[in-house]
Amino acid sequence: MSENQNPSPSPEEIEAAMSANAADELNRLQGELAELKAKSADLADQFLRAKAEAENARRRAEDEVAKARKFGIESFAESLLPVCDSLDAALAIENATAEQLREGSDATLRQLMSALERNKVVIVNPEAGTKFDPHQHQAISMVPADQEANTVVSVLQKGYLISDRVLRPALVTVAAPK
């Protein structure tokens, strides 16, 4: 045999090399597993923190809505107190004349309308001839009239809006088709 030829490795050498490769691969995989476990634990922690933060934000939002409702009603009620005071003062007068009662009622109505306006309540009181709007008007009856069909003839009861939302539609009579 010549010395330049590579002798084939012995089975023991092959087994030792495979064992070393397997050990290296096992160490690499164990390191990768440890990294992935750490990353998983970190992500689980981030998830729990985000979930808790979302729950806290939801609770804060609910509390703010409840406070807004409470204080919104409080503000509205506060604006009505002068109306109550005026009515109490009117009832305290024992010998009021009809004219005094009328003047007091007018003043009280102005106070009430002012309070409603401050709270964005708007009157719906369509003029005769206005096109009937089913979103703001409720037709009580149709009557023959000398005006265009489906227009308001008269208002039986005013309606009210709050921020473009109908609280109560205006009750109206409507011109019947000719």
Curated annotation (Swiss-Prot):
Xref: Gene3D superfamilies: 3.90.20.20, Head domain of nucleotide exchange factor GrpE
SUPFAM superfamilies, per database record: Coiled-coil domain of nucleotide exchange factor GrpE, Head domain of nucleotide exchange factor GrpE
CDD domains, per the entry: GrpE
Gene Ontology CC entries for this record: cytosol
Signal peptide positions on this chain: none
Keyword Cytoplasm: yes
One of the Pfam families matching this protein, by short name: GrpE
Alphabetized UniProt keyword annotations: Chaperone, Cytoplasm, Stress response
Gene Ontology MF terms: adenyl-nucleotide exchange factor activity; protein homodimerization activity; protein-folding chaperone binding; unfolded protein binding
Predominant location: cytoplasm
UniProt region (Disordered), positions on chain: 1-22
Gene Ontology BP annotations: protein folding
UniProt subcellular location: Cytoplasm
Residue runs in coiled coils: none
General function of this protein: Participates actively in the response to hyperosmotic and heat shock by preventing the aggregation of stress-denatured proteins, in association with DnaK and GrpE. It is the nucleotide exchange factor for DnaK and may function as a thermosensor. Unfolded proteins bind initially to DnaJ; upon interaction with the DnaJ-bound protein, DnaK hydrolyzes its bound ATP, resulting in the formation of a stable complex. GrpE releases ADP from DnaK; ATP binding to DnaK triggers the release of the substrate protein, thus completing the reaction cycle.
Subunit structure, interactors included: Homodimer.
Family that this chain belongs to: Belongs to the GrpE family.
Protein name as annotated: Protein GrpE
Species of the source: Acidovorax ebreus (strain TPSY)
Encoding gene per record: grpE
